[in-house]
């Protein structure tokens, strides 16, 4: 959302202008209502706020709040309440084969909105339903919440459960995981590896 403009939606990869227009004050109030006091303080320090919201019906949204031209703006992505399967995503069978491997490193890369998080979630959920492993996720924010099946799953959110990706990864080595999902590769994380 941008101030003094219509609200835009991205549908199937295309930006669509909606009929909804918000005043500066409405936009500010709406965005501030989503932020904790700590997140508001970080915004006023010039930092972005990246977090997930969950509605009472279990639907989740990923929210990024930022300033532009001295005003608040937000990008809000709707997330599926249920983790899709690899087959529902029409992903190649090689991803299931990789998820079956007992060891290795899998990097999923691509631009914003290309399905990286959803692909990783489908792979983690596949492992969850096929093996008795300990899965540890480190995310900012947690996007998909898994229901444990055969695996034990611990989901750690940066800024809420741990201070940083690097700290969480250091701790993870003592938590006996079989699978670690790291939601982002940041420079500080690359330095500790």
Functional labels for PLM-detected ranges:
Residues 3-111, 119:
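N-terminal "pre-motor" subdomain/linker immediately upstream of P-loop NTPase catalytic cores
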Residues 115:
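Conserved glycine(s) of the Walker
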Residues 79-82, 153-154, 178:
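Short, basic, glycine/proline-bearing loop/turn elements
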Residues 123-176:
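P-loop NTPase switch/communication element
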Residues 13-16, 141, 173-193:
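Conserved P-loop NTPase nucleotide-binding/switch module
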Residues 87-90, 137, 160-164, 186-189:
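Short secondary-structure boundary/capping elements
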Residues 82-87, 156-160, 182:
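Short, flexible loop segments at the rims of nucleotide/cofactor-binding pockets, characterized by
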Residues 1-5, 190-192:
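Conserved small/polar residues in nucleotide/adenosyl-binding loops
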